[in-house]
Amino acid sequence: DAGSRALVHAAAGGTGSLLCQWLAWHGVEVIGTVGSEAKVDVALAHGCTKVLVDADDDAAGLAAAVRAVGSGGGVQVAYDSIGRRTFSASLACLERRGLLVSFGNASGPPPPLDVLSLSTQGSLFVTRPTLFDYVATRAELLAATTRLFAAIRDGILRVPVHQRWPLRDAAEAHRALEARETTGASVLIP
């Protein structure tokens, strides 16, 4: 909702940069995390109002930094594509009745969750969406892609392709992704 705050991990990556743009277009204050100082400007250019460099495993420090941006109140929603390394920080930075959208495993799968802990942390919600639960039919797929391409056509979303590799260099592309050296989308060319 307009006026709310959201946390987006990997805000300079392919999915993160699109998500930041979409949220900002809807009037959401977007707090992004990136893996290095070199990625801060990329995240800002895609709609983040504040960018935090998260280069270590300090979950408590990251959660405190996110809460400080929101004057101590946390965020209403956290989008976590990283997984194991950021999952606890994502939960800890949510305000009461906040939502964690866990959709990636870049650092490994998220740890098991004690459901009872959600009540002690403020009646939190956690979801693990998969694409085909949202576009289960051809009609749903066409409707979703129509909205997506309209947003690109209308300039709401810019698709940043910052890396291109020949298909024969796929191993190098994977190495760069795993080393957190990329921004925006990465494309393999046959």
What are these regions (language model features)?
Residues D1-R5, G72-G73:
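Short helix-loop-beta connector
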Residues L7, Q76-Y79, V101:
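N-terminal Rossmann-like NAD(P) cofactor-binding module of classical short-chain dehydrogenase/reductase
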Residues R138-P190:
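C-terminal hydrophobic helical "lid"/dimerization subdomain
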